[in-house]
Amino acid sequence: MAISAGLLSLSVRFPKNVRTNDFWREHYPDVVKDAEQRTLARLWAKPTGDVAQAEADLFTAAMVPYVDDPFRGTKQRRVLADGESVLDLELDAAREALAKAGLAAGDVDLLIAASFLPANVGVGNAPYLAQALGLRGAAWNLETACSSSLVALETAAAFVEARRHRHVLVVVSCTYSRVAPLDDTMSWFLGDGAAAFVVGPVQAGRGVLGFHTIHTGDTCGTFFYDLAVDEKTAQPKIVMGATAKTGKALAQNAQPNLTACAQGAAKQAGVSMNDISLFVFNTPTAWYADFGAKALGVDPSRTVSTYERYANIGPVLMPANLHHAASTHRLRDDDLVLLYSVGSVSSASAAIVRWQSVGLGDAPPD
């Protein structure tokens, strides 16, 4: 008899430190003054040339209302405080996810960690988490940039369906503030956060119904990581950057990636877009939910976005949006939900899930 797999619990955690746009206005006024000549404005540039062509590009058209704002629609972001670790956030989320699923450490067969980026260079967080949680099963790392949480869900569900593992704990984090210099305007749309969820057997016909995942190799040569010398400590550090072609490449591939994944997952699940109650995209920009709705031909009211609260939190976006939808009562049992995430130089993925009540962690404070 086939086993259905789905979420048993979902938890999110964010740093207490909230950084608003006034931080840069106060501490980096020259950067704000010259914002249109800096990274973020080059990344999300004002359209030039053929107006009709710009309007036909749904991603660019959705961006237009935000291009006169130097922060491109970002209002605030959560960032790690001095002495606060990504492992702290991950462990808090993981412990709550286990508690809400009614499980003890010994009930977990596998832990999958998707830390973007991990606490230590070259070594992922999975064994550190497993040790701290007292797990005795398998623990490994998975990374496919901003799609890590959804691909981890796909991986975990496959193991449960195959009866290889019964309970899989997935822990996801993003700490962009560690690699985004404050004098680089790209830091304006980046934040930190963590999430955790347990995947296990669910009632037949519920949980994950279909998946479709593709690579995003067409975005190779866009975002990158490099080494730089910290001016304060004179020590090497990792910094995030973007090439000149990044914005154009992301805009060109946004719609093809979304439609391919969404249609592929819907086909596997045997449903149509009209059957879906809520579309939970990862939302790395202020306009992404509107873009996604237009690309799939659905009403924007059927989408959810926490970008205004958290900015771009990479692989944590999808679980954060899903948690927000559930905690604000936008999901009911048996609702069909489309989950979608896209990462640069990594993967794009979509899932169709038939919702059931899950052990939901506490809503983050405002």
Task: Describe each model-derived feature in a short phrase.
Residues 1-83, 184-252, 256, 260, ...:
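Condensing-enzyme catalytic core mediating Claisen C-C bond formation in acyl metabolism
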Residues 91-94, 117-119, 128-131, 136-162, ...:
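Claisen-condensing/thiolase-fold acyl-transfer catalytic domains that form or cleave C-C bonds
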Residues 66-70, 93-109, 260-277, 325-330:
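Phosphate/pyrophosphate-binding loops at sites that engage ATP/ADP/AMP, CoA/4′-phosphopantetheine
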Residues 48-119, 125-126:
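Metal-dependent C-N hydrolase catalytic cores
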Residues 18-19, 122-125, 153-154, 179-184, ...:
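Short acidic, glycine/serine/threonine-rich loops at helix termini
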Residues 8-11, 143, 168-174, 199, ...:
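Short beta-strand segments
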Residues 163-194:
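Flexible, glycine-rich active-site loops centered on histidine and acidic residues
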Residues 62-68, 117-134, 170-175, 229-234, ...:
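Acidic-glycine-rich active-site phosphate/pyrophosphate-binding loop
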